[in-house]
Design a protein with these regions (language model features):
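N-terminal Rossmann-like dinucleotide-binding module
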Residues: 1-60, 182
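Beta-loop-alpha module in the N-terminal Rossmann-like domain of NAD(P)-dependent dehydrogenases
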Residues: 51, 60-125
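Short strand-turn motif at the edge of the Rossmann-like AdoMet-binding core
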Residues: 109-110, 136-138, 166-167
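Rossmann-like NAD(P)H-binding beta-loop-alpha module
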Residues: 142-161
């Protein structure tokens, strides 16, 4: 089993399974997925909030909880670190975790809030030979894979264009849009992206 430490013990780290979304296939949170897996062992969690640390500790029966994620990594030595904080600190934490020589990182979307941050995170992981993945998971969904197979088989004709419609935020939701289009087009190298976004406030802001 691979040992896992989680940074950020909120919704995606620990509690989203309890929200009762009818369309969600469980397990959904990283902690729940670790507990359900035969290949992963959840060993520790880190969060700035004492309340979230205590909730995580009691919910998942994990005694090793930390306020400082760097301390968690140094003391627990996890093989995988899952970063589930808010997006504005994702790249900063990802870079630090890679530089602490953690072998594998799972970083929730968005991996960064700018291309400059993304490039620095990528170069750091390549330099340290960190195995890296992020939360664009729809390419692993059976529905999307069925469409992918239909396109490749020619059963629905020749691929001419892919149009994605989604009422969502850029960093939270349209990451899925871009990755889905890429996946359905066999991950052909992207030459350019153009989109139209509304500047009106989003009706909700995910945590």
């Amino acid at each position: 089993k691979y040992s896992v430490g989680i940074i950020g013990l909120g919704r995606m780290g620990s509690t989203i399974d309890d929200e009762g979304h009818p369309s969600v296939i469980l397990p959904y949170s990283i902690a729940a997925a670790c507990k359900a897996s035969n290949n992963l062992e959840l060993i520790a969690g880190a969060d700035l909030s004492n309340e979230k640390r205590e909730q995580f500790k009691n919910k998942w029966d994990i005694n090793s909880v930390y306020e400082n994620y760097e301390t968690m990594i140094k003391e627990e030595n996890p093989e995988i670190v899952a970063i589930c904080t808010k997006a504005d600190v994702h790249s900063e934490i990802g870079i630090k975790v890679s530089n602490l020589n953690v072998p594998m990182i799972y970083l929730e979307k968005a991996i960064a809030c700018s291309l400059k941050e993304s490039d620095l995170l990528k170069s750091t992981c390549l330099k340290n030979k960190t195995i890296f993945n992020t939360g664009v998971m729809r390419r692993f969904d059976s529905v999307y894979n069925t469409v992918h197979k239909l396109i490749n088989s020619g059963a629905i004709g020749t691929l001419e264009s892919i149009i994605q419609y989604a009422h969502t935020t850029l960093l939270h939701g349209h990451i899925h849009s871009i990755d889905t289009i890429s996946f359905l087009n066999n991950d052909t190298k992207i030459k350019g992206i153009r989109g139209h976004l509304s500047t009106s406030p989003a009706p909700w802001e995910p945590l």
